[in-house]
């Protein structure tokens, strides 16, 4: 769906001579929020946002790559494959078997697609998580791709865009899954040292160790309207605290109101918003004031060792 974010907003038009036998089974989609039926083509033309209530439905990683300029994306680290370091087995199936089934169903090696692309002719590194792959749980490959993306952005001197959704750390990989939180965060310090920004986009749902680590230390944190963002889930918190939580708790709007994120941006405005942010950073990096400051630093006396 390279043209996903550039589709026309035309409504659905049907042929009057179609009989019921020719109507495909997946012609309609029911909105999980307002429960209204929507023509699938109309929904896709509207970037999978319900035209009746504005509910933002989930996108795949490949669909999110439609934010980039057409033909600009080049995938990196596609050869990284998850392993089963613990030989994890439950009564139902092994982790290795579950991985194989998920890979066959999704056509993905793991939950993250990473690479180099451009938005409005401005080069960036990008890493996108896909919730359809084991809930985008963060395992060794997820963390490695995110860390390499940060290091690649630092090496190339370009911004990093991460699009984040997750249910948390991948339990089947134990402490190896948990350590990805620290690994990715440390890689981002090298990006900061290179003077390049990390823009994190949080989409529904984003929970657990992912929320608690690298997206939360981004330079700019953006969320989609209505996205659920948190560490533990709302129901779990209510069970532990034995009291009801405030209305809208853990939604993007709640997080914005309490200063946890910077912006809530509708999907239809996302590409233009990212382009505007990238232009601001580009102007900052090429400003005369910054060049003068860099020159002053270069002439500072070196410390005596």
Swiss-Prot record:
Cofactor note: Binds 1 zinc ion per subunit.
Leading EC class: transferase
Keyword 4Fe-4S tagged: no
Pathway stated in the Swiss-Prot or TrEMBL entry: Lipid metabolism; malonyl-CoA biosynthesis; malonyl-CoA from acetyl-CoA: step 1/1
Domain CoA carboxyltransferase N-terminal, chain residue ranges per copy: 27-296
Residues reported to bind Zn(2+): 31, 34, 50, 53
Required cofactor(s): Zn(2+)
Domain of life from the UniProt record: Bacteria
Chemical reaction(s) catalysed: N(6)-carboxybiotinyl-L-lysyl-[protein] + acetyl-CoA = N(6)-biotinyl-L-lysyl-[protein] + malonyl-CoA
Pfam families attached to this UniProt entry: Carboxyl_trans, Zn_ribbon_ACC
Cellular compartments annotated: Cytoplasm
Chain intervals annotated as zinc finger (C4-type): 31-53
Keywords: ATP-binding, Cytoplasm, Fatty acid biosynthesis, Fatty acid metabolism, Lipid biosynthesis, Lipid metabolism, Metal-binding, Nucleotide-binding, Transferase, Zinc, Zinc-finger
GO cellular component: acetyl-CoA carboxylase complex
UniProt-listed Enzyme Commission number(s): 2.1.3.15
BP GO annotations: malonyl-CoA biosynthetic process; mycolic acid biosynthetic process
MF (Gene Ontology): acetyl-CoA carboxylase activity; ATP binding; carboxyl- or carbamoyltransferase activity; zinc ion binding
UniProt function note: Component of the acetyl coenzyme A carboxylase (ACC) complex. Biotin carboxylase (BC) catalyzes the carboxylation of biotin on its carrier protein (BCCP) and then the CO(2) group is transferred by the transcarboxylase to acetyl-CoA to form malonyl-CoA.
Assembly and binders: Acetyl-CoA carboxylase is a heterohexamer composed of biotin carboxyl carrier protein (AccB), biotin carboxylase (AccC) and two subunits each of ACCase subunit alpha (AccA) and ACCase subunit beta (AccD).
NCBIfam families: accD (TIGR00515)
Similarity comment text for this entry: Belongs to the AccD/PCCB family.
HAMAP family in alphabetical order: AcetylCoA_CT_beta
Stated name of the protein: Acetyl-coenzyme A carboxylase carboxyl transferase subunit beta
